[in-house]
């Protein structure tokens, strides 16, 4: 899935979203995608394939995948890398 980062949520009250940096060859990325789906975090997730959209990965300084970045509008709130459990993801969002 190739999704570009879009900025078309005008009028929305909650501008938080998760950027999920991934690659087709990355096994932990596939596991993390399943954990994210199960966690049902309630935020939009934009998927960025670092091989297809390398300029975006460079812009965000991505050094490894999987990497998640929590954004509030255009501000990076926090990030984490590596495989995580559903519980770790929920704690990360709510922390």
Give short role names for the model-derived ranges.
Residues 41, 63, 75:
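Structured loop/turn residues at beta-strand edges in well-structured enzyme cores
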Residues 1-8, 44:
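N-terminal "domain-start" segment that seeds a small globular fold
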Residues 60-69:
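Structural micro-motif
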């Amino acid at each position: 899935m190739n999704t570009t980062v879009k900025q078309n949520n005008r009028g929305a009250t909650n501008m938080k979203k998760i950027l999920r940096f991934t690659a087709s060859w990355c096994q932990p990325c596939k596991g993390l995608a399943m954990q994210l789906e199960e966690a049902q975090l309630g935020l939009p997730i934009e998927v960025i394939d670092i091989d297809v959209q390398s300029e975006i990965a460079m812009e965000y300084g991505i050094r490894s995948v999987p990497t998640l970045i929590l954004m509030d509008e255009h501000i990076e709130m926090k990030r984490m890398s590596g495989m995580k459990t559903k519980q770790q993801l929920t704690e990360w969002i709510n922390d």
